Amino acid sequence: MSFTEDQEKIALEILSKDKHEFYEILKVDRKATDSEIKKAYRKLAIKLHPDKNSHPKAGEAFKVINRAFEVLSNEEKRSIYDRIGRDPDDRQMPSRGAASGFRGSAGGSPMGGGFEDMFFNSRFGGQRAGPPEDIFDFLFNAGGSPFGASPFGPSASTFSFGGPGGFRVYTNNRGGSPFMRQQPRSRQQQQQAEENAVNSQLKNMLVLFIIFIVLPMIKDYLFS
């Protein structure tokens, strides 16, 4: 199978780039308009289409530019990509933002805005943190995942048992074991627990009093 030097060069050049670097793959600026993106894609597609390029890697390179164009030509996907720095449909690799976030920033959170921006900011409307209940709801109830679904599945559910001091159960409804977290006890329940402990101690003392004081007195009275 014959191919030209230029055909080999363009195919290998595309494949040498990170598969998530969509702007670099299409050779356009990050502020490129839709028409500029389409023009750049068509230019590359003509050179890489298997019918036009006989290099063994041309088909693979063609798929790469197709994916880049599919994301950048879609307003919603492009917006997500610009935020997380990777293919919004690929959940296997950590985002560039999350990876760089662990380096920290001067005077700021050691997370540096990577992981927090990706998850907490999208969940809590730009705030850096939220109540523990909100975080659990986010993790188990599809409550604002940056990919539109809970990481534990779209069918996750929450059930509460035993009132304020009971348990909140999170389950993905797929036959797996539920996740349980005890809710904070109310002040009234804490007081009740303390009273129960005192009563238990009094009962123990009463038993000892009967054994060592009352019973010997009864014995002396009966057999004296």
Curated annotation (Swiss-Prot):
Residues 18-87 form the J domain. The gene is HLJ1. One of its GO terms (biological process) is ERAD pathway. Residues 84-93 have a biased composition (Basic and acidic residues). It comes from the Eukaryota. Present with 1840 molecules/cell in log phase SD medium. The modification Phosphoserine is found at S109. Keywords: Chaperone, Phosphoprotein. It comes from Saccharomyces cerevisiae (strain ATCC 204508 / S288c) (Baker's yeast). The keyword Chaperone applies. One of its GO terms (cellular component) is endoplasmic reticulum. GO terms for molecular function: ATPase activator activity. The keyword Cell cycle does not apply. InterPro entries: DnaJ_domain, DnaJ_domain_CS, DnaJ_subfamily_B/C, J_dom_sf. It holds the Pfam family DnaJ. This is Protein HLJ1. Residues 84-107, 173-192 are annotated as: Disordered. Residues 181-192 have a biased composition (Low complexity).
